[in-house]
Design a protein with these regions (language model features):
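C-terminal accessory helical subdomains adjacent to catalytic cores in phosphodiester-
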Residues: 2-153
Length: 153
């Protein structure tokens, strides 16, 4: 799920305020989603359910390295503009602060004909998962959690 695209009645969304830290928003919504699954489906299902709500669009990850993203889509002419966006925020995870200034909207302003599946994948491959993990702490924490899970038989 992408936090800003969630309906207003999504689990815990009504408990989140604009001035909350992004980690607190994430914790609140994931907790309420997990609680809902537990109440509706029971412990046997809930213990296998790992709630995760991405606090930004996929394109937020592309701001992990503006240089690599621009290089990947062969648009080195926009590196400085991408860096300007990135430098306004603590992490790429903070960029998605409204539906009008979401990462994809910012990229579409710079890249005419931006195709999310094509350019997004090319950019992500150029950036690499290690850089995304380093720049996006909530995403990294979730991946670390998944990596530590025992295999189910």
């Amino acid at each position: 799920f992408d936090f800003y695209a969630l309906p207003s009645d999504f689990f815990g969304r009504d408990q989140v305020s604009a001035n909350m830290l992004i980690q607190s928003k994430y914790d609140t919504v994931c907790h309420e989603l997990g609680r809902y699954v537990l109440n509706k489906l029971g412990q046997s299902v809930a213990r296998r359910f790992i709630p995760y709500v991405q606090m930004y669009e996929f394109e937020g990850l592309l701001f992990s390295s503006p240089e690599k993203f621009a290089q990947g889509i062969d648009r080195l002419d926009i590196v400085h503009k991408l860096k300007d966006v990135r430098n306004q925020f603590e992490t790429p995870e903070h960029i998605n602060n409204s539906q009008h200034t979401a990462p994809s909207k910012r990229i579409k302003q710079l890249v005419k004909g931006y195709q999310k599946p094509l350019y997004g994948v090319i950019g992500a491959l150029e950036i690499g998962l290690p850089t995304m993990r380093q720049e996006c702490p909530i995403f990294n924490t979730w991946l670390n959690y998944l990596a530590q899970l025992p295999l189910l038989e």
